[in-house]
């Protein structure tokens, strides 16, 4: 069995899990998420714990059991606490403003960028150079953060661009004559 799959997923109070065939749904205070469980993975509910096992001893099925356990754990954390990613804008005149489901970005181009946020993701701008992306789906929050960062990645000479709050930008020295 996968080392990851050996650990059970503990369900906190207020989180409901329903298993109908291969469809697993998780409901919590912040919302609900669904997952199609792979046919080679068996999900066992014991009280307030979920255990995962491969249906046969095949190496690929063991790995899939660990992957499914990690996905379900992220779903449980998402519906109970939620996920957030923080981005910083570094550069003169770089600004961000959240208006509903649209994020307006001024990143030094000749035109402003209007980024339409997908359903299930909310963006906040505590100030003009910070963006907070929040949601219950870890993959979607990370995807949105990566797409916003891709508009203007941090460049290595001055460090200007959109970066994750915890990101360390590798700097280069300018050419000398």
Curated annotation (Swiss-Prot):
Q: Name one GO biological process term.
A: cytoplasmic translation
* Gene Ontology MF annotations: rRNA binding; structural constituent of ribosome
Q: Name one GO cellular component term.
A: cytosolic large ribosomal subunit
Query: Could you tell me the keywords of this UniProt record?
Result: Ribonucleoprotein, Ribosomal protein, RNA-binding, rRNA-binding
Superkingdom field: Bacteria
A matching Pfam family: Ribosomal_L6
NCBIfam families in the record = L6_bact
The subunit field of the Swiss-Prot or TrEMBL record says: Part of the 50S ribosomal subunit.
* PANTHER family according to UniProt: 60S/50S RIBOSOMAL PROTEIN L6/L9 (PTHR11655), LARGE RIBOSOMAL SUBUNIT PROTEIN UL6M (PTHR11655:SF14)
Which HAMAP family did the record assign? Ribosomal_uL6_B (MF_01365_B)
Q: Which family does it belong to?
A: Belongs to the universal ribosomal protein uL6 family.
Query: Function, please?
Result: This protein binds to the 23S rRNA, and is important in its secondary structure. It is located near the subunit interface in the base of the L7/L12 stalk, and near the tRNA binding site of the peptidyltransferase center.
Name of the protein: Large ribosomal subunit protein uL6
């Amino acid at each position: 069995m996968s080392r990851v799959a050996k650990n059970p997923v503990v369900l906190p109070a207020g989180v409901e899990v329903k298993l109908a065939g291969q469809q697993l749904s998780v409901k919590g205070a912040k919302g609900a998420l669904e997952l199609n469980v792979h046919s080679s993975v068996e999900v066992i509910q014991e009280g307030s714990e979920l255990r995962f096992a491969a249906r046969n001893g095949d190496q690929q099925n063991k790995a899939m059991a660990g992957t499914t356990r990690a996905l379900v754990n992220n779903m449980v954390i998402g519906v109970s606490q939620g996920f957030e990613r923080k981005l910083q804008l570094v550069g003169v005149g770089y600004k961000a403003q959240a208006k509903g489901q649209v994020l307006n970005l001024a990143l030094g181009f000749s035109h402003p960028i209007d980024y339409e946020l997908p359903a299930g993701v909310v963006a906040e701008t505590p100030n003009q150079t910070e963006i907070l992306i929040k949601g219950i789906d870890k993959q979607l929050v990370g995807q949105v953060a990566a797409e916003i960062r891709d508009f203007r990645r941090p460049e290595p000479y001055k460090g200007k661009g959109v970066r994750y709050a915890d990101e360390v930008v590798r700097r280069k020295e300018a050419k000398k004559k």
